[in-house]
């Protein structure tokens, strides 16, 4: 793979995260609420070799996201809630889209909440590691290749069959401290290697202060069932923990995340039961918000892995610097530019797993609701 520079023109006309901060309120009466949020993201990439004006490749990743979140008041303290988030890709011919159904349900869960006793829900949701890792996801248009952002990989990113209990302020007794407990039941085809995984448990603890400081710690453990012809393999459990910190006050946003995992990511996507023994992930971001509406930021990502089956003891999974800025016209409309400097160097592992080594320039206009 040649080291080349990629120009990505990203123009999301409607953007909103799953938190639905600027969601459209469809219904709100007597404590019952229904909100709609969504995005449509035209995304086209232009790639060319370094210092060359000739375009070597083009790629269309246009997609749309639509979500609904609702709440129903049952009693003064008891309420039910649900959320579903749906994604569709629009870069395939219509005939193929009808046959292959390139659609994705990103989120889909429902639950109950009772006063200070907390909430409990079940379905497709975020794993507890996301509680800590999300602190460095402050700039949504940066596409980080973090191993702790992969979906359908145990309790990392989004996954299904998650039973989640959350409690804010420790039953109303301690302000600023919240915790979560999570259980994932056994199911086939859960992880990236299309294997079978047994049940697992996870937890997270969060502290927030009035001064803008936040600290989050998350962890999970799960047993992986390997194939019958590999029963002699050791360390079949999948374990991970993450620590996240942020400061958000006085126009300054600074956050960092450290994550460590064992047997989490496949070393070779084409070989069953081949996993990186240990992975470490470091992320950091700093942003300053000017009163005029400009928000320049600088972020860093470094993911490394260790595998006894690899000729190299330490493998670079991702390494990048992002230099970004955005300008907010108002709470709904903003424009941005991002330059990603990819620090990865070509080797057998990167070629084998088709990990990109190109630099990327992204620019776009965002309208969010």
From Swiss-Prot:
Keyword presence, Metal-binding: no
CDD domains: gram_neg_porins (cd00342)
Gene Ontology BP terms: monoatomic ion transmembrane transport
One MF term in the entry's GO annotations: porin activity
One cellular component (GO) term of this entry: pore complex
Mitochondrion keyword on record: no
Ranges in a coiled coil: none
Main localization category: membrane
Mode of membrane association: Multi-pass membrane protein
Record Pfam families: Porin_1
Location(s), subcellular: Cell outer membrane
Top-level taxon of origin: Bacteria
Keywords for the protein's UniProt record, in alphabetical order: Cell outer membrane, Ion transport, Membrane, Porin, Signal, Transmembrane, Transmembrane beta strand, Transport
Subunit-structure text: Homotrimer.
Job of this protein: Forms pores that allow passive diffusion of small molecules across the membrane.
Family, per entry: Belongs to the Gram-negative porin family.
Full protein name: Porin-like protein BUsg_347
Originating organism: Buchnera aphidicola subsp. Schizaphis graminum (strain Sg)
